């Protein structure tokens, strides 16, 4: 699975950790790597981290797997989202989805989380502390993005989910199969499935703090706040073979 129209160098220069980018189906040929039944099957297994977010009268509720087979049969018409972490460790086709993103150093790769949502399903407005490529595998999803958030951003009083108390979208897009939305760390976002059969692959890239990178050099240094920032720039290690062309934005 490879890109057909995408320039890694221009992306790293203009968008990486700076601003979101919508990439309309850049693949040579897009094929959804995993069927919904396969994802549901993983959510039944011990040792696989899975969650179920259900919309109800009282708001969003979160359940942790492994789940019984009858749990999905009892969901009915209520909007819901199933999320399974690190699917790349369990399915070779999903693991192959990482390969086109190897222009980013491998040590930054976190995992590929896969979600399946019914019509109206989502996990609510939130932000993450990592770079992520949201690959629409099947179906459609509306994504909205807002301002940058941080430790002081107000959150709703929810026991299980870190949901933003305030979310004013500044841009929105509808993604279809094969489309990709890149989001930098800290950017508020909200995704809602349009219709059933919505599958999204979240290819996440963490940025270790300097304190993590030098942890082996001694505890006192690692605890120094001046080394706790996330400041490693992937553009510094960009292979020379990439040229400076403009990204395909659709």
Give names to the regions the model predicted:
Residues 242-250:
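Intrinsically disordered terminal extensions flanking catalytic oxygenase cores
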Residues 1-14, 28-179, 187-238, 244:
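Active-site region of the double-stranded beta-helix
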